[in-house]
């Protein structure tokens, strides 16, 4: 759940910020697809963990007993590592609309959201409706996504779909 739901979000936000500035848009779009794929994995792992918490799998429910402190510590460590990455990225300054402090708050906001989804209390003082980077949402959501044909690769073209049995001299009588 940490890997798909919290890790890399500093990097995602930075890449999306370039996309917002109309720089490196291709990279931002590709990372947007990767982030959406990670969201699918996140939904699956959240569903499985919640099923274990409910007791749907007695063996896994037994394993999970007493792991709450470990889960919380793992979230705290992940948040600190993401913040350290943000600090490294912005050691020489910020970019328009993004800096180390905003990214730190963003990571805390995401961590709280992920914790709530698993039935834990939030750890950080960032409200559920206080996304510090609301502009990232359209990069992370598939809603309203429409790709113009000229902006995507079409892979359905038939390649090699013509007969290539032309004989030497076949067009001798042909003139323009």
Q: What are these language model-derived features?
A:
Residues 1-176:
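Non-heme di-metal
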